[in-house]
Amino acid sequence: MKKLCILLLLISASSNLIFAQLPGKVHGSSRVLLPNGWSLSPVGRSLPLGDLPLNIQLSHDKKKIAVTNNGQSKQTIQLIDVKTERITDEKEIGKSWYGLQFNEKDNKLYVSGGNDNIILVYPVEKGKLLEPDTIRLGKAWPVKISPAGLALDDLNQVLYVVTKEDNSLYIVDLTTRKTLKKVALGRVAITGVYGPDRKILYISLWGANKVVLLDTKLGQITDSIATQYAPNELLLNKKGDYLFVANGGDNSVSIINTQTKKVVEVISSAVHPTQLTGSTTNALALSDNEQTLYIANADNNCLAVFNVAKIGESVSLGFIPTGWYPTSVKYCKNRIWVANGKGFTSMANPKGPQPISKVDNSELHEGSTPDKRLQYIGGLFKGTLSIVDDPKETVLKEYTQMVYSNTPFNKQQQAPSASNPIPFKKGDVSPIKYVFYIIKENRTYDQVLGDVKKGNGDPKLCLFPEKVTPNIHALAEEYVLLDNFYVDAEVSADGHNWSMGAYANDYVEKTWPTQYGKRGGAGDYGGNRKITYPRDGFIWDYCKRAGVSYRSYGEFANGKTAVIAALKDHFCVGFPSFDFEIKDTTRCAIWIKDFDRLLAKDEVPQFNTIKFPNDHTSGQKRGQISPLAAVADNDLAVGLFIEHLSHSRIWKESAVFILEDDAQNGPDHVDAHRSPALVISPYTKRNQVVSTMYSTSGFLRTMELILGLPPMSQYDAAAIPLYDCFTATPDYTPYNHRKAGVNLDTRNVALNKSAELSETFSFAKEDEAPDLQLNQVVWKSVKGEDAVMPAPRRSAFVIAEKKKKDDDD
């Protein structure tokens, strides 16, 4: 009987592992597990939408819903019949972003035309969109305008257009289609609404934490009202006496009395009571009787439901689970309509782009391709529309429990052994005093460690095996091999925010697809624009507030100046940032000199961030360091770094954490979020494979616990710390670097299609070069010009922690 039970357990474990590897539902449940550890269990009926639906609008007669899909790939406008819950029309649009408005007769649909700097006006007849007219605000990108939210005054034939690139409001005469006036707003804005008397237009300043009031008669800003952090969507009740403001960076909704111009209540929409960012409140809807408020929490994958019958005394009713990243919500005919920006699941893309094909331009970040068979990650996660019947109290209770089950935040984590060097909670003592955090660029696990037999790798996908990366391999073999680690980001635009803040806000998430689709946009990420910052800053800000000493080498600093205020006087002058003309081994030499200087004075900071970016490579651009040499140089820099630190007198109190900011530039047979990561310390276990599921946020949480820092967001607070990687018994044996197995000075000399293509790439900053195309070039440089790169895989599922072997195995 005992043997039978053991057999059944083994079969069960095996089945769970098999099912866990399939995209979609977790075996035995209706849930989908995402790589970040959060889950989905959407309810209701659904319709397929396009790439990244950012806004849905209900017609005045409540018969139609319009959708604007604003992702990296093909952008479209869709019409949906409310009664039949069917899509009646879909039109492709070159560029679009957020703005969407029916006129009062519902026979015209106004659509913001993105960085073409136009408004398209579609006639609407019998559920169809006809050929649009155009209102031009100015010349197309690179002229900075970029229309966003729209407010239409049919009575006076005026269209108010909020713009996000030149921080303005355009007042347009619909009769002449000319701009009557341009009003400076001062900060990035997203949308505007006006009340029934049309006297005041309320505009949310995404980048200024306030709503400004425009007198429509004067055409001037006359007042402002402070809100919480990063206000985005606005909603007025029918009387116009209360304005609801979603605060994307604060997990909240501000309710403003429009008569007194005061915030009379702030509703917290987070799933659990917390001040930590991470819910990303970004859309609002009221029930027909205006007693119930529905709030979309994009990063909690749910709606928060509140009774607002008595303003000032609003009551939480519960939560409704949605799809992935809900961006818009409307209420119509006892149904709740929710646009899920990333759909219901991630997925593999076995028919990924083939850059050698003449019909494929997805790798160029041009947004769309005529070959519908292609599956490119930038536009892979198609949106969906959830249609949920207004739930009764008992049903809402069930939905609420589902949301709690999907949410790892605030769940009790199992405590490590008392002797584990990683503290269980803030304030506990760790023998580790110095943390070194190395950030690299864009590689997947299989690309680098796919040849390691004891890990879950695919050697066929390994571009940079042990000969090219002997130090990465040695460190993974001698310490811990992490074969179930996933980055939280998709690309570098959000990758450095996730790596340094455990969060990418809604501005970042909603704008990078435009840039990556080659549709214009500033691309001011990586600390270059304040609106991209998390509310409470990055990890250096937390160090500063806690009195933890810190220093940055190249990350959010360019060698001359600090990109963010917290790094002023806290970065290494002369340490290069993103510049492929400079080797990573040169960067390491600069760090060694600076480290030795600080060590001699006993001034080595407790927290150190180091940027080694050259594994990104320059492709096959003639005259540049070849991809193999660039990755080998990066590998040697890591080896020299660990060698120098491990021979120093502070090694016994040190830990090094190494990861990629994202994993976009390569294939992986498990999931393209999977990436190589290393943990090196005297307290790291030796010669072990650790298959616990870890994430970028989990790395950050571990470092925070060592340094005595609080979590920065709901994501690192919910993440699993790296307890399984550490031991209470230190091994102080220093590391000696492995010599490079390839010539580090090899340059690209071949004149072929890949070289010609590489000449068009810009490497001025992260992800300037198209990621898929660059990856194809790198693949060919290693495998040969005629080699075809396997398609990368993207999945919502992750491999659950492998069943641990018994101690006596």
Where are these regions (language model features)?
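N-terminal pro-sequences and low-complexity stem/linker regions of secreted or lumenal proteins
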Residues: 397-809
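Predominantly soluble domains enriched in secretory-pathway, periplasmic, or organellar proteins
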Residues: 5, 10-11, 16, 21-420
